[in-house]
């Protein structure tokens, strides 16, 4: 499974490390991802999705049922 948030679609991006002498070496910026269980009241079961910290805030704001309708990947 690739490293991306199933709610917001955040993925890892590439960039540069910069030393004091401004030498550039490639690196990846990884999203803050967690596997989290959410209770679906309509189905009376938990689902487990990979979600970023911002994705959890979106779910808290909009509700899990609204977010499931617009998932980047089906659960």
From Swiss-Prot:
Q: Which UniProt keywords apply?
A: Ribonucleoprotein, Ribosomal protein
Q: One MF term from GO for this chain?
A: structural constituent of ribosome
Do the record's keywords include Ribonucleoprotein? yes
Presence of the UniProt keyword Ribonucleoprotein in the record: yes
Q: Name one Pfam family in it.
A: Ribosomal_L28
Q: Which GO terms describe its biological process?
A: translation
Q: Domain of life, per the record?
A: Bacteria
One GO location term (cellular component) = cytosolic large ribosomal subunit
Tell me which InterPro entries the record gives. Answer: Ribosomal_bL28, Ribosomal_bL28/bL31-like_sf, Ribosomal_bL28_bact-type, Ribosomal_bL28_sf
Q: Which family does it belong to?
A: Belongs to the bacterial ribosomal protein bL28 family.
Against HAMAP family, the record matches this protein to: Ribosomal_bL28
Q: What is this protein called?
A: Large ribosomal subunit protein bL28
Q: Which organism is it from?
A: Baumannia cicadellinicola subsp. Homalodisca coagulata
């Amino acid at each position: 499974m690739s490293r991306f948030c199933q709610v917001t679609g955040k993925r890892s991006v590439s960039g540069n490390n910069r030393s004091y002498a401004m030498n550039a070496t490639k690196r990846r910026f990884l999203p803050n991802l967690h596997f989290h269980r959410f209770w679906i009241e309509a189905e009376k079961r938990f689902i487990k999705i990979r979600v970023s910290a911002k994705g959890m805030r979106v779910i808290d704001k909009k509700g899990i049922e609204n977010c499931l309708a617009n998932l980047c990947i089906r659960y």
